[in-house]
Regions:
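Extended, H/D-rich, highly charged conserved domains that either
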Residues: 1-4
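Prokaryotic Sec-type signal peptides and long signal-anchor helices
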Residues: 6-9, 46, 209
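Surface-exposed intrinsically disordered loops and tails
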Residues: 7-39, 116-147
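PLD-like (HKD) phosphodiesterase/transphosphatidyltransferase domain
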Residues: 18-97, 157, 202
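PLD/PLD-like phosphodiesterase catalytic module centered on the HKD motif
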Residues: 75-222
């Protein structure tokens, strides 16, 4: 399947409409809950149905939800974190907003994220680096300057009920965004029922959350 995908999106870039038709035929979107095992979903697609489907899965998590966002949180997931069923909802963000100039629009977006952070069900970690050597166990950090747009978080995965017996892991190259759904060449895997995979991704999520969100008044524990 991935060979077919690679051939379909190969050089030179194929026209958009035939490409989207081919990828939706190759990787049709499941209806409702994904089947057990692994399902591939390739982009670009003709509509935002895949993004909305991811949001529905997140919204219907029963115990816990964990997501990463590299370029701000899209509106559809703001609604998820405002109204989802799960009593425990974590989000790991590169930054509070999409890249935008300072102004009223950015302030409104930051306020919206802060409102979500204030909800007792939500725990958000937003990328930053340690700025002091004065806390025992931590060393002052600086950025490498390798990438001006993504400095801390560039993982793309969602964990739905990862601590249960029937977890769902969604991972791959696509950000949970409109661009990665309808414009970019991306590939995602939806893995249902594999508790080992869910454990690994949950461990990675909490490792990154520790780095960007830890209480620096305490010595880090391993």
């Amino acid at each position: 399947m991935f060979m077919t995908f690679t051939s379909t999106v190969g050089y030179p870039d194929p026209p958009s409409t035939p490409l989207k038709n081919s990828l939706e035929t190759l990787t049709p979107l499941p209806v409702g809950t994904p089947p057990s095992g692994t399902t591939a979903i390739f982009s670009p697609r003709k509509s935002l149905d895949a993004l909305n489907w991811y949001a529905d899965l997140a919204r219907n998590a029963s115990d816990s939800l964990f997501m990463t966002f590299a370029f701000g949180m899209p509106d559809v997931f703001k609604d998820v974190y405002a109204n989802a069923l799960a009593p425990l909802r974590f989000a790991l963000l590169e930054q509070k907003t999409l890249s935008m100039k300072a102004g009223l629009e950015k302030k409104a977006e930051e306020d919206r994220i802060q409102q979500l952070r204030n909800k007792p069900e939500n725990v958000f970690a937003i990328g930053d680096f340690i700025r002091t050597n004065e806390v025992d166990g931590w060393l002052k950090e600086r950025l490498s300057g390798l990438n001006a747009h993504v400095r801390y978080v560039h993982n793309k995965f969602m964990l739905v009920d990862p601590l249960g017996n029937d977890p769902i892991v969604i991972c791959g190259s696509a950000n949970f965004s409109e661009a990665s759904t309808i414009r970019n060449d991306e590939n995602m895997l939806v893995i249902r029922g594999n508790t080992r995979v869910a454990d690994i991704y949950l461990g990675e999520f909490m490792r990154q959350k520790l780095i960007v969100f830890s209480c620096f008044s305490q010595t880090p524990s391993l």
